[in-house]
């Protein structure tokens, strides 16, 4: 109910059907509500079963370690780098089939000329991230939402990424909220970038126990290294009016 992997379920599954499981793949953090997953406990439960971790959303924002993992996925575009370049970190000695065949480059794992400019841009993007400052803005935004819209439901748990605030506003529709927010000069989303434009309730929010009405009236606010106190103040200022108009429209 808090966006965290059900460890008891996983433990029971591994105990009963471990011999059938080839790989356990888990997100380091949820991209819709920001919940951080207990990766170390997943690895412990997995035992000899390989564990892959998708840390795309967490890179730079919170500590990420490869300890105990078999594979780790990273991507440049989540840290200000270009789209289309990332990294797959693999345990030493792991034999994986080649994605592309040809000249045998990169020890026959990835043939073809590498996109050197994109790779260099990825490296350049891996600079420091102001986690403490962004976390402070996130907490202020959550507090502001609660005080300005008392019946709002905060879906982001306490243990979450610095820059994600996910909130449901019962009696509204996400598309209407987006339009009204855009008219106020505020950019936000009804979910993750991967699911934007998909007109159905978020499976993440439904798994949290939200009703369909609550799930469709949800916005995700993303804060980053360039977000300011003024941005948060402006959002909190216009939010009550936006919610009132959205409810009237519905």
Where do the language-model regions lie?
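Pyridoxal 5′-phosphate
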Residues: 1-250
């Amino acid at each position: 109910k808090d966006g965290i992997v059900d460890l008891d379920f996983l433990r029971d599954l591994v105990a009963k059907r471990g011999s059938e499981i080839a790989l356990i793949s888990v997100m380091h953090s949820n991209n819709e509500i920001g919940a951080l997953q207990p990766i170390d406990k997943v690895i412990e439960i997995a035992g000899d079963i390989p564990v892959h971790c998708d840390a795309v959303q967490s890179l730079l924002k919170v500590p990420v370690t490869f300890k105990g993992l078999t594979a780790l996925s990273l991507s440049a575009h989540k840290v200000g780098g270009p789209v289309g370049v990332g990294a797959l970190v693999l345990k030493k000695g792991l034999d994986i089939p080649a994605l592309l065949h040809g000249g045998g480059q990169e020890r026959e794992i990835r043939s073809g000329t590498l996109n050197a400019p994109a790779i260099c841009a990825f490296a350049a993007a891996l600079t420091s991230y102001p986690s403490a400052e962004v976390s402070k803005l996130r907490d202020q935004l959550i507090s502001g939402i609660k005080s300005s819209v008392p019946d709002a439901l905060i879906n982001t748990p306490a243990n979450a990424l610095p820059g994600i605030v996910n909130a449901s506003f019962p009696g509204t529709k996400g598309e209407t909220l987006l339009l009204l927010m855009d008219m106020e000069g505020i950019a936000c989303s009804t979910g993750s970038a991967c699911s934007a434009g998909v007109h159905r309730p978020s499976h993440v929010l439904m798994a949290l126990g939200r009703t369909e009405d609550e799930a469709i009236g949800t916005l995700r606010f993303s804060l980053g290294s360039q977000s300011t106190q003024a941005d948060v103040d402006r959002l909190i200022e216009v939010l009550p009016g936006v919610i009132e108009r959205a409810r009237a429209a519905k």
